[in-house]
C-alpha cells in the first residue's frame, strides 16, 4: 500500500538536516493522531518484532520481554512487547499481540507468531504459517503461491535479523514462518478473499504504524484494488463511486467482483492508479467503465477529481453547460434544483431528458479520457439513486 508520512514527533537530533545518519528515536504511541485517536502498529511490525525476538531466543536461549523495531522512515523505532509462546523442536518461536490503536481493524489484538530456524541457503526464506494467506492471483506484487507478506514487512524482518547478528543479510540463512492465530476466520471479515488471498490474513504495512481511520490507508486500498482488477490483463474493468456501479457490472456486464473498483470520492487518484498500473504491466486496457450517480460523476466534467461535497462544488453547476447545449428547456429545471437527484425526480419521463443524460455521459467520458492513460475506450453509465438508468443504458 502507499506509504503515509509518519507524524514528525520532531526533535533536533532526529530532524537535523545536516546530520548524515540521524539517531533513531522512540516512536511514542501515546501521542494521539491529529484526529484525536490512538495510533497502533501494523501486522508487519508485529511480525518483525516476533522475528527479532525469535532470533534472540535462538542465539541466547532467552526470550526478551520486548524488542525495538526500526521503522521504515529510518528516524524512529518502536518498542514492542513480546508474548510467551510454546516452543517447538527445531524452531525458535515468539509471538506479538498486534495493537491497532483506535483503528477499526479486524486484526486488532491478533496473535502474530514467528517460527524461525537456520537454513543452508544463505537466504532469508519467508514461509506461510497457519492463519497467513497465500497469493492466488496476480496484481499484488507478490508471486502466485507466495505467502501474503508484503515487501516492506519482508525488508523490516531482514533488517531485524541484521540488527541482531550485526551482519549483512547476504550472510543470513533463515526460514521465517509467519502465522496468525484464527487468521483464516479473521481474513473472512477483510477484503482478502476478493483480492485473491486465501487461507488467512496479510502481513501488511508501509510505515509500520497504523494511522487510525487514515485517509491514506483508504486510498492505498484503492490502489491495491486497481492492481488486482488489472492483474490478469482483462478486457474491461469498472470504476464507480459506490454500489451502483457494482450492481450494474454484476447484473449487466457479468464481470467478476475483482474487476469492479469502488473509488469513493477519489476519481482522479483512482484513474492515476489505473494509468500507473497499466504502465507497469505494459498493457493497454480495451474498455474502462465509469458508472454511478451524476451527483458525483458530473463534477468530472469541470475537472473536479475529488468529488467530496465538502471539497468541491455541486454537480448541478457542471450540468448547466450540457443542458444549454443539448436540452435548453431543462436549464431552468436545473437552476431550480438543489441537487442532481431532485432534478432527476422532476424531469423523469420528459422526451428531452434522455439525450441530455447521454450528452452528459459523453462529456464525462471526454474528461476521463484527458486524465487516464493506456485506455482504448471509455464508457460512462449514469443511474439515479433508485438504480434507474438515465442515459445510454435507459
Where do the protein language model's features map onto the residues?
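A structural signal for small-residue-enriched, beta-sheet-centric alpha/beta enzyme cores
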Residues: 6-31, 38, 195-202, 206-359, ...
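Generic N-terminal targeting/processing segments that precede catalytic cores or assembly contacts
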Residues: 2-189, 193-195
Amino acid at each position: 500500500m502507499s506509504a503515509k508520512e509518519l507524524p514528525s514527533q520532531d526533535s533536533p537530533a532526529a530532524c537535523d538536516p545536516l546530520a548524515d545518519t540521524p539517531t533513531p528515536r522512540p516512536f511514542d504511541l501515546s501521542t494521539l493522531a491529529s484526529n484525536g485517536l490512538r495510533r497502533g502498529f501494523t501486522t508487519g511490525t508485529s511480525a518483525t518484532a516476533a522475528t527479532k525476538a525469535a532470533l534472540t531466543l535462538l542465539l541466547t536461549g532467552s526470550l526478551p520481554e520486548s524488542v525495538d523495531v526500526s521503522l521504515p522512515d529510518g528516524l524512529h523505532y518502536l518498542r514492542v512487547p513480546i508474548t510467551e509462546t510454546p516452543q517447538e523442536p527445531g524452531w525458535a518461536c515468539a509471538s506479538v499481540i498486534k495493537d491497532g490503536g483506535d483503528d477499526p481493524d479486524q486484526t486488532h489484538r491478533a496473535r502474530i507468531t514467528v517460527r524461525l530456524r537456520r537454513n543452508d541457503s544463505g537466504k532469508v526464506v519467508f514461509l506461510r504459517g497457519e492463519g497467513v494467506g497465500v497469493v492466488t492471483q496476480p496484481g499484488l506484487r507478490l508471486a502466485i503461491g507466495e505467502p501474503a507478506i508484503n515487501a516492506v514487512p519482508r525488508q523490516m524482518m531482514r533488517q531485524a535479523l541484521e540488527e541482531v547478528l550485526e551482519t549483512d543479510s547476504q550472510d543470513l540463512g533463515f526460514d521465517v514462518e509467519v502465522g496468525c492465530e484464527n487468521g483464516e476466520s479473521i481474513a473472512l471479515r477483510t477484503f482478502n478473499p476478493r483480492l485473491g488471498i486465501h487461507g488467512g490474513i496479510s502481513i501488511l504495512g508501509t510505515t509500520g504504524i497504523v494511522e487510525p481511520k487514515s485517509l491514506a490507508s483508504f486510498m492505498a486500498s484503492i490502489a491495491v484494488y486497481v492492481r488486482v482488477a488489472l492483474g490478469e490483463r482483462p478486457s474491461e474493468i469498472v470504476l464507480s463511486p459506490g454500489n451502483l456501479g457494482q450492481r450494474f457490472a454484476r447484473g449487466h456486464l457479468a464481470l467478476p467482483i475483482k474487476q469492479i473498483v469502488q473509488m469513493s470520492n477519489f476519481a482522479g487518484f483512482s484513474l492515476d492508479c489505473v494509468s500507473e498500473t497499466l504502465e507497469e504491466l505494459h498493457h493497454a486496457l480495451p474498455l474502462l467503465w465509469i458508472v454511478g450517480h451524476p451527483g458525483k460523476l458530473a463534477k468530472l466534467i469541470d475537472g473536479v477529481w475529488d468529488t467530496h461535497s465538502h471539497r468541491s462544488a455541486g454537480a448541478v453547476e457542471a450540468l448547466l453547460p450540457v443542458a444549454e447545449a443539448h436540452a435548453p428547456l431543462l436549464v431552468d429545471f436545473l437552476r431550480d434544483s438543489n441537487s442532481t437527484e431532485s432534478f432527476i425526480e422532476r424531469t423523469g419521463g420528459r422526451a428531452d431528458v434522455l439525450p441530455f443524460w447521454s450528452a452528459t455521459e459523453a462529456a464525462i467520458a471526454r474528461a476521463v479520457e484527458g486524465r487516464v492513460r493506456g485506455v482504448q475506450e471509455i464508457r460512462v453509465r449514469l443511474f439515479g439513486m433508485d438504480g434507474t438508468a438515465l442515459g445510454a443504458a435507459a
